[in-house]
From Swiss-Prot:
Disulfide bonds: none annotated. PROSITE patterns: GUANYLATE_KINASE_1 (PS00856), GUANYLATE_KINASE_2 (PS50052). It is found in: Cytoplasm. ATP binds at residues 13-20. Keywords: ATP-binding, Cytoplasm, Kinase, Nucleotide-binding, Transferase. The keyword Nucleotide-binding applies. This is Guanylate kinase. Its EC number is 2.7.4.8. Residues 6-186 form the Guanylate kinase-like domain. The keyword Ligase does not apply. Belongs to the guanylate kinase family. It comes from Blochmanniella floridana. One of its GO terms (cellular component) is cytosol.
Length: 210
C-alpha cells in the first residue's frame, strides 16, 4: 500500500448520526491532532449558512462530469440524487507534506479508496437507536414525511455497512463520542509503524545506547 508522511482517515455515518457536528468540534479543539478536513465537491445547492470553498465546492453536474472524465476524483458517489466527490491531487499533496487528512464520505467512497490500495483507517459513527435517529432527522422540521422516510431508508442502508470499518463510535453522549473520536485518531498517530517512519533517528539513537 502507498504510504505518505500524513495519515488518511475516513469518517462515515448515516444522516442524523451527528458526524458533521463531531467533525466540527474535532477541528475546533485541534491543538494536538493537527488534522485537516478535506473539502468535497458536490452538485447539490448550497444550504443557508454554507460557504463555497469552506463547506463544499458547489459545482454543476456538467462540471462534475468533466472532473470524472478527467479522472480527477479519488472517490465519488451519488447520494439523494446529488453527486459528491473528493479531488485526488489535493489529498495527495496534503498527505505528502505531512498533513493528517480526514475525509467525510460514505461507504461507497470508502470502498472506492480501499480498491486503490491506499493506507488509511476508517471510523463509523452510529446513532444510539433507530428511534433517536428518526428524531434527529425530524428535528430540523424542514422535510416532509416522505423525505424523512427516504432518509431513514438511506440511513439504514448506510448502517448495514458499519462492520466494514475499523472503528465504531456510538454517538449517544456527544462529549463522550468526541473523546472517543479524538482517541482513535491520536492512537493512529502513535502507532509504532508511524513513529518509526517519522522518528526513526531518535528511536535508533536511543536503541544504540543500549
Amino acid at each position: 500500500m502507498k504510504k505518505y508522511s500524513g495519515l488518511l482517515g475516513i469518517i462515515s455515518a448515516p444522516s442524523g448520526a451527528g458526524k458533521s457536528t463531531l467533525i466540527n468540534a474535532l477541528q475546533k479543539n485541534d491543538s494536538i491532532l493537527q488534522i485537516k478536513l478535506s473539502i468535497s465537491y458536490t452538485t447539490r445547492k448550497k444550504r443557508p449558512g454554507e460557504v463555497h470553498g469552506k463547506d463544499y465546492y458547489f459545482i454543476s453536474i456538467e462540471e462534475f462530469q468533466n472532473m470524472i472524465n478527467q479522472n480527477m476524483f479519488l472517490e465519488y458517489a451519488k447520494v439523494f440524487n446529488h453527486y459528491y466527490g473528493t479531488e485526488k491531487n489535493s489529498i495527495k499533496l496534503m498527505l505528502n507534506s505531512g498533513v493528517h487528512v480526514i475525509l467525510n464520505i460514505d461507504w461507497q467512497g470508502m470502498n472506492q479508496i480501499r480498491n486503490k490500495k491506499l493506507d488509511f483507517y476508517t471510523i463509523f459513527i452510529l446513532p444510539p437507536s433507530q428511534k433517536e435517529l428518526e428524531k434527529r432527522l425530524r428535528f430540523r422540521g424542514l422535510d416532509t414525511d416522505q423525505v424523512i422516510f427516504d432518509r431513514m431508508k438511506q440511513a439504514m442502508n448506510e448502517i448495514s455497512h458499519c462492520k466494514e470499518y475499523d472503528y465504531i463510535i456510538i454517538n449517544d453522549d456527544f462529549n463522550i463520542a468526541l473523546i472517543y473520536l479524538q482517541s482513535v485518531i491520536l492512537s493512529k498517530q502513535l502507532k509504532i509503524d508511524y513513529q518509526e517512519y517519522h522518528n526513526s533517528n531518535l528511536i535508533n539513537n536511543l536503541l544504540s545506547c543500549l
